[in-house]
């Protein structure tokens, strides 16, 4: 595929993924109000409903990779987008909290399929010397959807009703499925009846575990940044988090080719060490300037870590196993957030908010050690 059609195909996959994440983001500020309001349930129910999608997201990523390798990237992305649209339709069903949990389980499965198969599709489109950059840019579809989705959901709710939010949550991924059907696919799936290996790729385990340790810092920032700054009387928590998010985007846009230019393993080591530094700056911040600086350092490192590790994964497997490898790898992101959030929460409960960030520092340093020892060996 020549350069221009490949760029058009990349843009299409990006838009499809962003539409799916817009549906996820639009419901984030709306579902808690719906559970506490019209349904009249508890805060515990809010937590269960909100987090249910992570269960199937984790489980379906390797399966999505398997489908992408054996049936094609497009069919896996379309199936995932349609599954996400079903989730939006299920929000309309008046089945209380159990019905919402089922809807969120469908959403997790759909989102997991779209991002996993989409990642493999993007790598198929990328020249070998630009894979790291395109992997990083593709990840911005997640940030775009989760950043723009919540205000869209709020706007729809205030202008209309819960039902219109559900309609948007169904319509956005449905539009994505229609777009995906028109994107050309270069990859040739396995012949009928031929299985391309197990659901879990062993080559992804060590990079995936490194990623899990690295995303503990994201869990700490997401849960306790604002609370830590408020506790110290610093405030500006929203601005500090915005600085973190903006740096993630800027580094992906301006420095997204670092893994391609200097190598994914050195980038992964450096990103882990710099992430630890940023988290330490946040933990010791005594004013807004120090907190924002720490958040920006953390954001720059966090932005580089994922594409570096993903590039290691795709470099170790043949094209026909790329989907399974990326499915296994991306599942470790969910695992890291799923286990890292209660880990830093326990640290905060026992020793205060600052302790949550020191635990994340230790995890980031652990990621650097693994990248320096284990990943260096696998690349040699």
Regions found by a protein language model. Give the residues of each.
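Helix-loop-helix hairpin linking two adjacent transmembrane segments in secondary transporters
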Residues: 138-181
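Helix-breaking motifs and short loop linkers at transmembrane-helix boundaries and internal kinks
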Residues: 40, 72, 93-98, 263, ...
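C-terminal membrane-cytosol helix-exit motif in multi-pass small-molecule transporters
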Residues: 170-189, 370-375
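Residue-level signature of mid-helix packing/kink "hotspots" within the transmembrane helices
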Residues: 54-62, 146-147, 248-253, 337-338
């Amino acid at each position: 595929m020549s350069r221009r059609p490949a760029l058009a195909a990349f843009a299409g996959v990006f838009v499809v993924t962003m539409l799916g994440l817009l549906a996820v983001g639009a419901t984030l500020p709306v579902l808690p109000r719906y559970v506490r309001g019209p349904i009249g349930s508890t805060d515990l129910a809010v937590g269960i409903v909100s987090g249910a999608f992570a269960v199937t997201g984790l489980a379906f990523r390797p399966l999505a990779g398997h489908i992408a390798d054996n049936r094609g990237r497009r069919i896996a992305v379309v199936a995932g987008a349609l599954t996400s649209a079903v989730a939006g339709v299920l929000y309309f069903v008046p089945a209380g909290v159990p019905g919402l949990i089922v809807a969120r389980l469908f959403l997790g499965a759909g989102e997991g399929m779209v991002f996993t198969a989409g990642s493999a599709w993007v790598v198929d489109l990328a020249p070998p010397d630009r894979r790291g950059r395109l992997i990083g840019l593709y990840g911005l579809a997640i940030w775009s959807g989760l950043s723009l989705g919540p205000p869209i959901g709020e706007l729809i709710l205030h202008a209309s009703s819960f039902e219109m939010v559900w309609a948007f949550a169904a319509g956005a991924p449905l539009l994505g499925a229609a777009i995906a059907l028109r994107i050309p696919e270069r990859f040739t799936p396995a012949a009928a009846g031929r299985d391309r290996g197990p659901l879990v790729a062993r080559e992804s385990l060590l990079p995936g575990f490194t990623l899990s340790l690295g995303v503990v810092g994201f869990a700490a920032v997401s849960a306790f940044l604002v609370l830590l700054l408020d506790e110290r009387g610093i405030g500006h928590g929203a601005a500090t988090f915005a600085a973190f998010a903006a740096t993630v985007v800027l580094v992906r846009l301006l420095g997204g080719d670092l893994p391609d230019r200097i190598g994914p393993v050195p980038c992964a080591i450096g990103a882990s060490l710099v992430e630890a530094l940023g988290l330490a700056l946040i933990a010791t911040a005594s004013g807004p300037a120090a907190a924002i600086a720490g958040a920006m350092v953390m954001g720059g490192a966090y932005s580089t870590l994922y594409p570096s590790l993903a590039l290691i994964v795709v470099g170790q497997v043949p094209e026909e196993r790329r989907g399974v490898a990326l499915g296994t790898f991306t599942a470790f992101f969910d695992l890291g957030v799923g286990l890292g959030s209660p880990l830093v929460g326990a640290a905060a409960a026992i020793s205060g908010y600052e302790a949550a960030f020191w635990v994340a520092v230790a995890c980031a340093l652990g990621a650097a050690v693994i990248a320096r020892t284990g990943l260096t060996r696998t690349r040699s």
